[in-house]
Each structure stands twice: as structure tokens, then as C-alpha cells.
Regions:
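Structural preference for beta-strand elements that scaffold enzyme active sites
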Residues: 33-35, 71-73, 104-106, 152-154, ...
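Short glycine-rich or small-residue beta-strand-to-loop segments that form or flank ligand, phosphate
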Residues: 75-77, 105, 290-294
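Conserved Radical SAM active-site core
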Residues: 1-101, 111-140
């Protein structure tokens, strides 16, 4: 835990290695907001989940931060049969006492990789269970909003995708406070895409593009966003008859099929699965578009050390990283010269290979 990174970069901290002088320093310097991985407000359960005998007693720091008007955001990684159900309800109710200085809490389902030998046997949530989590959270949002002007508790996008439900309207996200936790990313993307499309329709070039534009491109994404990106592609192909967009959800063989986010897709999985498509006769087009978060921050390198150039050579096509945004997606599909302008500096680097021991 490093409270400086929480303040500067938005990292979430558990408070487990912090002492009272550390909290007093935060208060004195008014370092806010402080983002806290709470997981549960049950002290005994928190010790168990974090494998730290001090984790429960560190919850007292929330009271001190609240009393000194330090703005906070909370996170609960929800594990089935551990801190869900009544435990999750208790956690939300307990944390709501820190309103309005705790401005938001996100509930995110635990990501479960295939590398779990010797670890607690976590299970995936079902569609029905995801719906129950959403219902419980949404039933509390109205009360908090009426009293504090904040919806406070938010279910991450994964719950809505798993439950097969529409994403909430933009107003429910309170200005996208928890975007880095996957709360509202899809709603923001959908709204940006729709706004960019309307702007394109009003442009002087639109009618001429409808008649003359011709291109075939492929988009690779994670399973989590596949349906949404596919709908975008269908919409653009209806707008431009000469446009063909193939959208493929890359299966995560490296970490396991239960990992569905694009940011944890390795180069080997991307290349291997798209080569299979090519070998089966699918014409992928002139360019492969990939989300910028597939690459390490500021680099053209995947998690497993394969590079964008490796993918270009293997697939024999241009590979372009796309900034996460509706306008950028449309620009990348319709503009062969598109280049991502900003570095993908919001991605946390995870090394997806083992170094040889010597």
C-alpha cells in the first residue's frame, strides 16, 4: 500500500500496512481522494480475505478519515460465498455511513484465472446471481441519491453483461467516479459512439463517403465487450455499404477462459486465433484494430513480450492500437491513417510470463 499512489494515480489501497501517523499525514496534507479496497466491513472476514491479522482493525481509519472530511472512494471485490449476499449488504450499509465524504463504492466480481492451485476454491457467479447483485445495489441507489445527491454504490459493467441487462443511463454513474474499476466504461463508450456517429452524419463528407467508401478491417477484443463492439460494427456497415468489419472475441488461453477483459489478452493468443481465421479462408482485410490496453503503457508490446511488429509479420497485415473511446473507434475504422494519439498510460503492467531460472 502506498497512499501517495492512491492520491496521484488512483491506486486502491487496503490500509493494512498503514499506521496512525500515516493517516495523520494524509489529513495534514489533505491528500484526497484516497481510494480504498475495503472488500468487507466484517473485521474477522476482512482478516481472512486479505490474509492479514491487522486488516480488521484498520477499518477504524475510515472513521478518522471521515471525521476529518477526507474524500474517499471504496472498492469491494465480490467473491462468491465469501463476501457476497448478506455480507455485501452489510458492507454497503456500513460504508454508507461515511457519506458524503466516501463518494462512491464499486462492487466488482472477482477475476478468476486458471492458475489457482493451492488457493481458495472461488466460483464464478451465474447469470441469475449477477441479476440479484444488481437488484440489491440498484434498490439502494435511489435512497442515497435523494439524501446526498450521489448514487454511491455502483455495480461494475461485468455484472450487467453477465446478467444480460442494459447498462444504466449516464446520470446514474455520478460523473463516472469509478471508471477505472470498470464502472460505466461501456455506457461511456456507447454514448461516445452515438455522439460521434451523429456528428459524422452531419458532416459535409458523409453523403460522398456513403457512396464511395470501401474497406475491410478486423477488430479483436475481449469477450466482455464483444457484443457491444459487434453492434457498433453492424451500425457502421449499415451506414457505409462498402465497409466490412470483422469482430472477433479473443479467447484467453493464457490466463484462462474466465478472464474476459481485453487488457489481459496476450500476443500469442491474439496471433494464434486470428491465424486460424486466416487459414480457414476468412479475409481479415488490410488492418487489425486492437484496444490500446492490450499493450503495456507507452509501448508497442503485449503482456507476453510479443510486439505489435511480431503480430504484423505473423498476420501479414497492419496492426493498429485504438484509444478507448467511441470517436476513436469510428476514426480508426474509417481512416486508414489513424494513429492513437495518447499513450495508454492507465494500464497497470502485469508480466505474463515466467523468467527462466538460471
Amino acid at each position: 500500500d502506498d497512499s501517495r499512489l492512491s492520491f496521484l494515480q488512483g491506486n486502491y489501497i487496503t490500509l493494512t500496512n498503514m499506521k496512525l501517523p500515516d493517516i495523520e499525514r494524509i489529513i495534514q496534507m489533505h491528500l484526497a481522494p484516497i481510494n480504498i479496497s475495503v472488500q468487507t466491513t466484517n473485521p474477522e472476514l476482512r482478516c481472512k480475505m486479505l490474509h492479514n491479522r491487522f486488516a480488521g482493525e484498520k477499518l477504524k481509519f475510515l472513521d478518522i478519515l471521515y471525521e476529518n472530511h477526507i474524500e474517499m472512494n471504496g472498492q469491494v471485490v465480490v467473491c462468491k460465498n465469501v463476501n457476497d449476499g448478506k455480507e455485501l449488504e452489510r458492507t454497503i450499509d456500513d460504508l454508507s455511513k461515511f457519506l458524503p465524504f466516501m463518494r462512491s463504492v464499486s462492487a466488482v466480481p472477482a477475476g478468476i484465472t486458471k492458475y489457482r492451485e493451492g488457493l481458495y476454491p472461488l466460483e464464478l457467479f451465474t447469470k441469475e446471481e449477477a441479476g440479484q447483485v444488481i437488484d440489491m445495489i440498484e434498490s439502494r441507489q435511489k435512497k442515497y441519491y435523494e439524501e446526498f445527491g450521489l448514487h454511491f454504490i455502483h455495480a461494475s459493467d461485468e455484472w450487467y453483461i453477465l446478467a444480460g441487462r442494459e447498462f444504466p443511463e449516464e446520470e446514474r454513474y455520478d460523473g463516472y467516479i469509478q471508471l477505472e474499476n470498470g464502472v460505466g466504461m461501456m455506457r461511456l463508450l456507447i454514448n461516445e459512439f452515438q455522439e460521434a456517429l451523429e456528428q459524422l452524419r452531419r458532416s459535409q463528407e458523409y453523403e460522398q463517403m456513403k457512396k464511395s467508401f470501401s474497406r475491410t478491417v478486423t477488430i479483436a477484443t475481449g469477450k466482455l465487450t464483444y457484443q457491444t463492439i459487434s453492434k457498433f460494427a453492424e451500425t457502421l456497415m449499415e451506414e457505409f455499404p462498402g465497409l466490412t468489419v470483422h469482430v472477433y472475441a479473443i479467447r484467453n488461453d493464457f490466463f484462462g477462459e474466465t478472464i474476459t477483459v481485453s487488457g489481459l489478452i496476450t500476443g500469442q493468443d491474439l496471433i494464434g486465433q486470428l491465424k486460424e481465421k486466416k487459414e480457414s479462408g476468412v479475409k481479415l482485410g488490410d488492418t487489425l484494430l486492437i484496444p490500446g490496453n492490450m499493450l503495456r503503457s507507452g509501448e508497442q508490446v503485449f503482456l507476453d513480450d510479443l510486439t505489435v511488429e511480431d503480430a504484423r509479420r505473423a498476420l501479414e497485415m497492419e496492426v493498429t492500437a485504438v484509444e478507448s473511446g467511441g470517436q476513436d473507434l469510428i476514426d480508426a475504422i474509417l481512416n486508414v491513417d489513424y494513429a492513437m494519439e495518447r499513450e495508454n498510460d492507465n494500464f497497470v503492467y502485469i508480466q505474463a510470463y515466467k523468467k527462466d531460472e538460471k
